[in-house]
Amino acid sequence: MTPAVFNITLAFSFSLLGTLMFRSHLMSTLLCLEGMMLSPFILATITPLNTHSMIMFPIPIVILVFAACEAAVGLALLAKISNTYGSDFVHNLNLLQC
């Protein structure tokens, strides 16, 4: 395992750990999810350069599109929850009332 791949895997692991630890605020959870999406994007960008594979070049763009959609939905949810409840605490939400 090269040092770059190790660092990217470590960044993904820390983002996953942050998602599991900081679940009280929605904003910190969304930031950790963005870190989790950034790590596969960087890995998918570096891999075709090392393997000289032309078929893998569109994959980072697809990952980036999914990350942008996830960020847009997350920010829309954050704005709606902040306007409705006045804060972004996750424990104030009752998902069974939908």
Swiss-Prot record:
InterPro entries reported in the protein's UniProt record: NADH_UbQ_OxRdtase_chain4L/K, NUOK/Mnh_C1-like
Catalytic activity: a ubiquinone + NADH + 5 H(+)(in) = a ubiquinol + NAD(+) + 4 H(+)(out)
Enzyme Commission number: 7.1.1.2
Disulfide bonds: none
Family: Belongs to the complex I subunit 4L family.
Biological role stated in the UniProt entry: Core subunit of the mitochondrial membrane respiratory chain NADH dehydrogenase (Complex I) which catalyzes electron transfer from NADH through the respiratory chain, using ubiquinone as an electron acceptor. Part of the enzyme membrane arm which is embedded in the lipid bilayer and involved in proton translocation.
Segments traversing the membrane: 2-22, 26-46, 59-79
Localization per record: Mitochondrion inner membrane
Entry keyword Lyase: no
Assembly and binders: Core subunit of respiratory chain NADH dehydrogenase (Complex I) which is composed of 45 different subunits.
Primary location recorded for the protein, binned into one broad class: mitochondrion
PANTHER family named among the record's database cross-references: NADH-UBIQUINONE OXIDOREDUCTASE CHAIN 4L, NADH-UBIQUINONE OXIDOREDUCTASE SUBUNIT ND4L
Stated name of the protein: NADH-ubiquinone oxidoreductase chain 4L
GO terms classed as biological process: ATP synthesis coupled electron transport
Keywords carried by this UniProt record: Electron transport, Membrane, Mitochondrion, Mitochondrion inner membrane, NAD, Respiratory chain, Translocase, Transmembrane, Transmembrane helix, Transport, Ubiquinone
Entry GO MF terms: NADH dehydrogenase (ubiquinone) activity
Any one Pfam family match given in the protein's UniProt record, by short name: Oxidored_q2
Gene Ontology cellular component list: mitochondrial inner membrane; respiratory chain complex I
Topological category with respect to the lipid bilayer: Multi-pass membrane protein
Gene responsible for this protein: MT-ND4L
Native organism: Microtus pennsylvanicus (Meadow vole)
Highest rank taxon of the organism: Eukaryota
Keyword Transcription regulation applies: no
